[in-house]
Amino acid sequence: MHKTLPSSEYLVLSRGQWDEHLSPEEIQAAIDAFYAWHGRLVDEGRMRAGQRLAREGRRVSRQAVTDGPFGESKELIGGYWHVLARSLDEAAALMAQNPTLACGLSFEVRPIDPERASAWVASNETPPARS
C-alpha cells in the first residue's frame, strides 16, 4: 500500500532563546529529544532537514550592508526547518509537538509560495494597493 504524503511545504523559523533557569543538562536533554523527534518526522516524510543559524550575519539593503544579528534577542532566528503538511493548521499542530517548546523556544510557521514573484500579484513583498 502506498502512503500519501502531505503536499504543501512550510518553512519553520525557530525563534527565541532557552529559558534562563535551565541547566546545561536540561537543555541538552531537550536538544536530544528534538533530534529524535525530528529524525522520526524526516523518516516519515513529514519534515525535511534544516539547520541552525550562526550568531553573526549581515543585512543588505540599497543603503548599506549592516552587521547583525538583528532585532531583540528574544526575536532572533536560531534556525529553520521544512515541514510537509496538508494545511497550515496541520503544520502548526506538528510544530506544537516540538520538544523544545517547553524550554523557551517558539516557532513561526509560514507556507512556502510555489508561485514566481510578480509585480502584478499581491504578496508580502508588493506595496499596498494604490488608489
Placement of each model-derived feature along the sequence:
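Conserved, structured core segments of small domains
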Residues: 1-131
